[in-house]
């Protein structure tokens, strides 16, 4: 009988253990968190000065019941915000790893992504222009990621430098790595602009040189520390681009034309300037100047330079000069001289010398751009563009193309794309006020108009395709 009662007592204990008891066994329903990352982007792109906004709450779910949530946003592995909505004022360029941690009292979930803060001026067509009263303007049309061009943005300098007053009479523009150099004749100076943000970084002036009025710059797009700045009177100054100084040039001491040509190959630059006193080419390699007189003068007589441009890519160049109303073409190797096996000069390395019949007459002031790929020179007079092939002994009598969609158009500057497939043309109408500048893009091979942009600048001074 005692065993009977013992069995009943044990069964009772087991029955008690069947009741719910949260204190001994964890049977509470866990409210797990999930983030619908498939509905969110892995990468976000924003331009500088734009804002990234992400409200994470619509993408968060809790499995059992809604519990209070906490949020932690990290940017570049550092705490950024504890709000449910992320706001990033995009100022610093670059790519930043991002993460949000969403938690309740039971669990946490994570969402990771990348934020790319890009320059709105990374790569594209850049136009420097001047109004009737000399006011300068920088316009920019962006190259989009898919290869197509965007729309022109005007007044880029004033917009990105509030309160800064820029000088009048801009004369030239050149890029060196991450910087854009713009020269001004009024209040003579060179302004150094960040090429990606168009923010002012430095102002280079030389009040100690009263005749410093920069009209052209020969500036390599590399890590070179110095460049050539040609003043209005033909005097050359040394532009120390890294230090931001204007110095007297101790090698180029003559008087030079603003017509010049340069390219940068290997370790040394190749500068070709025209000495207006000696009527000859001066070849400057960054260290020494050579006036090409070792075997007698290359040009007999008082030739005046009209154009200097590349002939065969990184191999030869051509000089067009005028003498007594006639135009002469002289093509030389980049090194000017023939060398023997001991690298001694043995004579002038002429590639071609001939008289060119000029109709219409080509002038030094005519906007020009050369294409070594197509072996031709494009030049403009009024609203007409002409194409002259290097092999021809006469200039064309008929235009290659004409700007005829607007009246009274005058072409003021030309440039060519880096791959030489497109010609960029800047024109303006003097009888139109305000933003009276027009940009045209032509196919280099066919002359077909690819696109045109109206009222996107003042009178164009310089046009260039700015690469990254």
Language model: regions and residue ranges:
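Sec-dependent signal peptide recognition
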Residues: 2-9
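C-terminal motif of bacterial Sec signal peptides marking the signal peptidase cleavage site
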Residues: 14-17
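Acidic/polar, low-complexity intrinsically disordered N-terminal segments immediately downstream
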Residues: 19-160, 164, 428, 432-447, ...
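Surface-exposed, polar helix/loop patches in the mature regions of secreted/periplasmic/lumenal proteins
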Residues: 98, 103-112, 117, 195-224
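Repeated scaffold domains used in trafficking and secretory/extracellular systems
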Residues: 159-177, 207-226, 248-270, 293-316, ...
């Amino acid at each position: 009988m005692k065993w009977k009662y013992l069995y009943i007592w044990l069964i009772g204990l087991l029955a008690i253990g069947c009741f719910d008891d949260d204190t001994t066994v964890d049977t509470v329903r866990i409210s797990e968190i999930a983030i619908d990352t498939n509905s969110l982007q892995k990468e976000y792109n924003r331009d500088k000065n734009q804002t990234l906004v992400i409200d994470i709450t619509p993408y968060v779910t809790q499995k059992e019941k809604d519990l209070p949530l906490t949020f932690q946003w990290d940017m570049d592995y550092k705490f950024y915000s504890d709000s449910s909505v992320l706001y990033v004022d995009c100022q610093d360029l670059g790519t930043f790893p991002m993460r949000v941690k969403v938690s309740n009292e039971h669990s946490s979930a994570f969402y990771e992504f990348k934020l790319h803060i890009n320059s709105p001026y990374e790569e594209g067509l850049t136009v420097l222009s001047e109004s009737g009263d000399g006011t300068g303007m920088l316009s920019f049309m962006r190259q989009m990621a898919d290869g197509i061009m965007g729309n022109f943005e005007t007044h880029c300098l004033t917009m990105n430098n509030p309160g800064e007053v820029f000088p009048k009479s801009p004369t030239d523009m050149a890029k060196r790595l991450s910087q854009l150099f713009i020269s001004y004749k009024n209040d003579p100076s060179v302004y150094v602009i960040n090429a990606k943000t168009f923010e002012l970084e430095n102002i280079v002036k030389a009040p100690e040189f009263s005749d410093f009025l920069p009209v052209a710059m020969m500036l390599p797009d590399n890590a070179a520390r110095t460049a050539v700045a040609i003043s209005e009177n033909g005097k050359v100054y040394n532009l120390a681009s890294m230090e931001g100084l204007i110095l007297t040039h101790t090698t180029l001491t003559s008087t030079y034309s603003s017509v010049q040509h340069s390219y940068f190959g290997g370790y040394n630059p190749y500068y070709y300037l025209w000495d207006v006193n000696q009527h000859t080419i001066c070849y400057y390699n960054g260290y020494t100047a050579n006036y090409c007189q070792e075997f007698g003068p290359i040009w007999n007589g008082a030739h005046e330079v009209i154009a200097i441009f590349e002939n065969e890519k990184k191999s030869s160049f051509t000089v067009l000069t005028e003498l007594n109303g006639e135009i002469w073409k002289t093509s030389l190797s980049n090194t000017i001289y023939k060398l023997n096996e001991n690298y001694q000069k043995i004579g002038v390395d002429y590639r071609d010398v001939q008289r060119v019949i000029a109709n219409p007459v080509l002038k030094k002031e005519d906007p020009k751009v050369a294409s070594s790929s197509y072996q031709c020179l494009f030049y403009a007079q009024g609203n007409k563009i002409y194409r002259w092939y290097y092999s021809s002994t006469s200039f064309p009598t008929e235009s290659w193309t004409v700007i005829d969609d607007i009246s009274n158009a005058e072409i003021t500057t030309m440039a060519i794309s880096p791959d030489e497939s497109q010609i960029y043309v800047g024109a303006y109408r003097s009888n139109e006020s305000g933003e009276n500048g027009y940009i045209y893009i032509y196919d280099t091979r066919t002359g077909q108009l690819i696109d045109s942009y109206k009222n996107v600048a003042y009178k164009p001074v310089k046009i260039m395709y700015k690469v990254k």
